[in-house]
């Protein structure tokens, strides 16, 4: 029976291929006609072009990802920017949709298939996602890679991990600062559960990618670190949003911003890699960051969905809409920086109350 289902699933995938190709073509034509050229996507393409020519992808370019991201983008950089922008837009939207769909599987909320689809569509059309599309950022692919690794490690029935882990390892490091903490817990969980394939493949992939990058441009490591430490991403020339104002700039003591991540670590030690633990790690990791753009808040959607599920399960159903509404509304205001601690607070309230209720029973 399983073989038949697998064959049928594979056949459906092949039948969907023409539709995917048509969608890519339409997206490319749209960007060509509309003159759609996101500023960060232009920087990605320029970095890929320079690396292909043996030059530095960092000097004079607002590119802060590891060089293997530029290597992966070389095929798209061969296209005219007007066409590749549309393909990138479609890729980002598909990644944002797929990341939420995967998360609903990992977190088992919502349970109704139609609700999963609707929620995935909502996140892919949310303001933070639109910021990703307009700027041409790679955040959606980093989010999808992070959730994919969580599924590979957290769901024991996964068998084929080589290719998914390789792809996820390359993409998740595109935005290392926003995924570092939850990624660390995912890899620690794989070691804790003695599922050695994921961390071994992950580490080997990054090592090979670093070596290949060194062959193409030996000085990449020093240039990448120099670019990160220079801090031009805090509002350098040409960025879509100049300057930066976050929680630290608002006067919040730095030590307080580390507390959610500390609690998430302790919760993971006690409970393992549950949806709540990873949601706390995502929100806590974003809270402690000294730098976070609006488009980076896309990674916060899984935590908001988990908070919504907990509120619905352990309180009035109307409360479940609060984290989702916050994700839809706050990015449209100057209060977007409050999103991570707000989601952390909702998670902590429900997780803490749930733990006390279980203890009393």
What are these regions (language model features)?
Residues 2-156, 160-163, 188-316:
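Primarily membrane-embedded glycan-assembly and transfer machineries that use lipid-linked glycans
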Residues 14-15, 178, 296, 353, ...:
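Sequence-pattern detector for short linear motifs
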Residues 130-141, 169, 174-181, 185, ...:
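Helix-loop-helix junctions and helix-breaking kinks within/between transmembrane helices
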Residues 161-187, 281-289, 323-329:
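Membrane-interface alpha helices of multi-pass inner-membrane proteins
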Residues 308-361:
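Aromatic-enriched
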């Amino acid at each position: 029976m399983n073989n038949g289902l697998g064959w049928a699933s594979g056949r459906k995938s092949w039948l969907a291929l023409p539709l995917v190709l048509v969608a890519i073509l339409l997206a490319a034509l749209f960007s060509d006609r509309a003159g759609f050229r996101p500023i960060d996507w232009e920087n990605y393409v320029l970095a890929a072009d320079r690396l292909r020519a043996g030059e530095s992808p960092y000097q004079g370019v607002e590119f802060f990802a590891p060089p293997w991201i530029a290597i992966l983008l070389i095929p798209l950089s061969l296209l005219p920017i007007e066409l590749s922008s549309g393909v990138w837009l479609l890729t980002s939207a598909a990644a944002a949709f797929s990341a939420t769909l995967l998360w609903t599987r990992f977190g088992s909320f919502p349970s109704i298939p139609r609700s999963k689809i609707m929620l995935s569509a909502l996140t892919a059309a949310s303001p933070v996602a639109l910021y990703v599309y307009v700027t041409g950022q790679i955040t959606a692919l980093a989010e999808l890679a992070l959730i994919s690794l969580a599924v590979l490690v957290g769901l024991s029935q996964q068998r084929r991990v080589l290719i998914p882990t390789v792809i996820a390892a390359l993409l998740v490091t595109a935005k290392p600062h926003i995924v570092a903490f939850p990624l660390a817990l995912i890899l620690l969980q794989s070691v804790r559960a003695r599922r050695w394939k994921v961390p071994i493949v992950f580490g080997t992939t990054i090592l090979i990618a670093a070596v290949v990058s060194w062959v193409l441009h030996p000085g990449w490591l020093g240039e990448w670190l120099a670019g990160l430490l220079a801090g031009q991403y805090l509002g350098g020339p040409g960025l879509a949003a100049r300057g930066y104002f976050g929680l630290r700039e608002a006067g919040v003591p730095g030590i307080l911003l580390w507390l959610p991540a500390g609690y998430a670590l302790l919760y993971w030690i006690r409970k393992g890699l549950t949806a709540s633990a990873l949601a706390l790690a995502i929100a806590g990791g974003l809270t402690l960051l000294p730098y976070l753009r609006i488009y980076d808040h896309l990674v916060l959607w899984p935590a908001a969905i988990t908070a919504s599920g907990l509120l619905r399960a352990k309180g009035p159903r109307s409360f479940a809409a609060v984290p989702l509404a916050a994700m839809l509304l706050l990015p449209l205001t100057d209060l977007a920086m409050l999103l991570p601690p707000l989601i952390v607070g909702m998670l902590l309230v429900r997780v803490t109350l749930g733990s006390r209720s279980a203890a009393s029973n």
